[in-house]
């Protein structure tokens, strides 16, 4: 089967949020274009070099998302629209894309990514820019998480600053396994990665083997009993709220928890749900997304 492009035209105020939601829900890549390009209504977004742009998207924007063959465009778009508060699913088109085009596009667009103080995420077709750094070798794939998205970056920066050797870590919603692998490379042991998607679990296992990281992965029913020193969950705000009691119960008293996949405007609502269990606040914000971090109280 061929890869597909989902093409949606919508107003500027929804374009960026929809792009982020599509990525969170499994799109391989997303771009925002001027829907009026090459017409009399075309609007330059950026002005003179060195000047800060007045806008970050066009008034009439086109969102183009690349989808793997197993994703149903209509279902994905409806879920993304619901996530950002659009009641009616926008009109859309679907275009077929040859698989070999995607492979070439991947290798031309993905470069090594520096994160935090000493982390590099490096595709397999690149050499590590700094062999002495903390290197994670990951290729873009069907499972979310290559370090390029703000939520992944935020969680990685938090883990780099938080994990101490020998601590136990639970990565709930592990996707590609990038956070679990990083935790293990920072000295955490044991590290458990959980995801609802069997394909993500298999991808995470393969990525851990490639990175020589001893991490145990499984579906939610395989999540071990007991508590962890650190719990990290980079998913979406609604699932985070629904799973608050369960996730908080996985943190040892005095242990740490980090939550992302949360837009800045959703932070207070998510924090309010978790405040029943943990002392939590916004740790850091990046490009409109936040990482919430907190400590479980000794009793609740």
Swiss-Prot record:
UniProt-recorded Gene Ontology molecular function terms: protein-lysine N-methyltransferase activity
Role according to the record: Methylates ribosomal protein L11.
Keyword annotations of the record: Cytoplasm, Methyltransferase, S-adenosyl-L-methionine, Transferase
Record's protein name: Ribosomal protein L11 methyltransferase
GN (gene name): prmA
Name of one Pfam family that matches: PrmA
Residues bound to S-adenosyl-L-methionine: 152, 173, 195, 234
CDD domains from the UniProt entry: AdoMet_MTases (cd02440)
Enzyme class: transferase
Subcellular location: Cytoplasm
HAMAP family for the chain: Methyltr_PrmA (MF_00735)
């Amino acid at each position: 089967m061929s890869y597909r492009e989902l093409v949606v035209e919508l107003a500027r105020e929804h374009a960026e949020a929809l792009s982020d939601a599509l990525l969170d829900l499994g799109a391989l890549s997303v771009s925002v274009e001027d829907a009026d390009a090459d017409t009399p209504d075309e609007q330059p977004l950026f002005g003179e070099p060195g000047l800060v742009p007045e806008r970050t998207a066009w008034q009439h924007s086109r969102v183009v998302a690349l989808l793997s063959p197993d994703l149903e465009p209509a279902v994905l778009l409806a879920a993304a629209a619901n996530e950002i508060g659009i009641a009616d699913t926008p009109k859309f088109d679907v275009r077929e894309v040859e698989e070999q085009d995607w492979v070439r596009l991947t290798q031309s667009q993905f470069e090594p990514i520096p994160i935090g103080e000493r982390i590099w995420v490096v595709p397999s077709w690149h050499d590590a820019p700094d062999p002495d750094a903390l290197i994670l070798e990951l290729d873009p794939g069907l499972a979310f998480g290559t370090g390029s998205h703000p939520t992944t970056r935020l969680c990685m920066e938090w883990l780099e600053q938080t994990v101490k050797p020998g601590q136990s870590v639970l990565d709930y919603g592990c996707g590609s396994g990038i956070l679990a692998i990083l935790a293990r490379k920072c000295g955490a042991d044991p590290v458990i990665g959980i995801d609802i998607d069997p394909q993500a679990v298999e991808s995470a296992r393969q990525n851990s083997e490639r990175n020589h990281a001893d991490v145990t992965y499984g579906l939610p029913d395989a999540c071990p009993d007991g508590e962890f020193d650190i719990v990290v969950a980079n998913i979406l705000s609604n699932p985070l709220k629904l799973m608050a009691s369960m996730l908080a119960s996985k943190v040892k008293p005095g242990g740490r928890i980090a939550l992302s996949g949360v837009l800045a405007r959703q932070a207070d609502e998510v924090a309010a749900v978790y405040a029943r269990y943990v002392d939590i606040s916004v740790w850091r914000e990046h490009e409109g997304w936040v990482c919430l971090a907190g400590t479980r109280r000794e009793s609740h």
